[in-house]
C-alpha cells in the first residue's frame, strides 16, 4: 500500500512538471515572482500518512506484526521568511491513523484465549503541531526544491491512557502526549495564482508510547520494552 501511494505521488508530481515544460532548459516567465519575499505567508495542506511502530522487546520472542493502513492529514501553515534560503514554519494539523497489532499465539502459551485476542486495533487521532526549519535551493524558473526538519508535539485524542479498562477488556492504551522529530523533502511549484508543494516527510517518536496493562504478566504488553511511532507523510500544500 505504501508503495502504491508513493508511485501515485510521483506520477502526480511529474504531471505538474510536464505542465511547466522546459523548467530547466529555458528562461521563462516567472509566476508569483515576489511570493517568497513576503515576511509572513499562510496556507493549508492535505495529505496521507502511513503509521508504523518500532517495538523493542524485553526477551527474544516472535515479533508483534504491525498491520498498517492509510490515514489522512489536514492542517494550516504559517511561514516566517528569514532570507531567500531559510524559513521557519508552524504547521498545526489533525492526523488520523489506523494500525493493528497482530500477535503470535506463542504469546498466549498456557493461557485460554480467543482468536480476537490475537489482534488489537489502534486508531489514533492526533493534534499534531510541528515547528520546522525549511532550507531551500535557489529558485529555478518556477520550482524550488527544499529539505525540511524539526520537532513536533502531538496530543493523541484517542490514547485510552486514563481508561481503567486495559487489554483484558480489548483496549490497548497509549500515552496522550508525544514528541517527534521530522525530516522531509519537497518541491515548491509556482503556479499562476498560488504556490503548490508536494512533499514527503518521515516522523519519528522520541518517547515510549505504550501504557502497560495492570497485569504485569499481560500477554499483550509484558514483553514490550519500548514502542515508538514512525510514519511517512505525503502532503500537498497550497499557499
Predicted stretch roles:
Residues 1-27, 236-239:
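Bacterial Sec-dependent N-terminal signal peptides
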Residues 18-43:
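Outer-membrane beta-barrel biogenesis signature
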Residues 31, 36-40, 48-54, 79-160, ...:
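Gram-negative (and chloroplast) outer-membrane scaffold detector with strong preference
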Residues 38-40, 68-72, 123-129, 143, ...:
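Residues that define the transmembrane beta-barrel architecture of outer-membrane proteins
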Residues 45-47, 98-100, 201-208:
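Short, solvent-exposed beta-strand-terminating loops
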Residues 49-73, 77:
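Surface-exposed strand-loop-strand hairpins of Gram-negative outer-membrane beta-barrel proteins
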Residues 55-65, 97-124, 157-174, 210-225:
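Flexible, solvent-exposed loop segments that connect beta-strands
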Residues 178, 183, 192-239:
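Predominantly the C-terminal beta-signal and adjacent terminal strand-loop region
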